[in-house]
């Protein structure tokens, strides 16, 4: 899964929309950042999944000191997930270094540490849904619930430059309807420009399968036939 990260330059500000880690690749292929961290004013986070947040501690490690805006549930989830990701980075670096020592190779450092993750969490600001927030003159945002994950959101952004206001929408990952616990996605009725997630956009999704029935069938089938 690709790491999501978009740079928005508007109203004299530079904001990242998400800062994710590319999953399924070697951790050291994730290290280059697409921007100079010290030149970013802030980050807007759509949701807590690592492909949308996994490089935030690396951003902080390399000099980012702005604010990170997310919904309150996303902030709470990131507190767990970013620390967990950092533990993995440290463990993998330790494992690589044991192999490197035996091979006489140069040691490696983790992409980031638990300390970096904790520093990143200090920059988070938990926001409410459906509340407009002025980040700077001419730059207003609002988080909208989209039912993908606890705290997940689309982000509406109003940019006013030279007396003209333009509305942007960053969809984030959008969930399905009629899910237990998670609310249905909120419909956004208008926008001048929409930046849409499309990781699975070329696939046809049929009705949600009966997972409980499938598990029960598997449980009954395996002991008798060892085949599914």
Region annotations inferred by a language model:
Residues 191-203:
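Gly-rich Lys/Arg/Thr-decorated short loops/hinges at beta-loop-alpha junctions or inter-strand turns
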Residues 10-66, 70-124, 174-185, 211:
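Pre-active-site segment of Zn-dependent metallo-hydrolases
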Residues 209-215:
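Charged helix-capping and loop-helix junction motifs
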Residues 218-224:
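Conserved small/polar residues in nucleotide/adenosyl-binding loops
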Residues 5, 14, 66-68, 165-168, ...:
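Beta-sheet entry/capping signal
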Residues 4, 10, 126-186:
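Catalytic core of the metallo-beta-lactamase
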